[in-house]
Amino acid sequence: MPTLQKKASLPDETIEQIRFLEVHSGRVHKLLSESYPVSNINEFMTIYAERLPEEERGADRDSTDRLISCFHYEKEPSKYHGVPFVFLLKEGEIFKETKERLSKRTGIKGKQLDKVKFAVIRGGQAYARPAYVDDEDILSEKMASDDQLALEHTNKTRSPWAIYERLNIR
């Protein structure tokens, strides 16, 4: 972390608000600590750096709130797209309120947000059957510690390779 800070000329306040995520197959594999050795990072992993959201910086460390992994997919959880992220799950919060916070976090709003289906993926397994979440549900009660929240919606940034495959399959 100090090397990154020096190379990017980042002040101490900024570097303290950055978190590193190790991602594989479109899902957050783990959060990397400041002391995590670079030599331990697998070459097949992607590393994302993100600024800590405001709500996490002000979160009470003694509360039962926890961080969960989230990812985007289309039709099947194994068809992931976009950048996965970590989100603060508040204990006892109804999903309608959680969805509003997710909207702020992802930038998905209005009609686009209405098209998104939210599902819990048990154990974070790519081939697990999604357990869809309703607005009245309390997400903290539906999710175990190793579950992930999935956002099902169309991939707006399709690669040319996906188009090529689609044309040749027909």
Where are these regions (language model features)?
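Cross-family signature of deubiquitinases and ubiquitin-like deconjugating cysteine proteases
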Residues: M1-R170
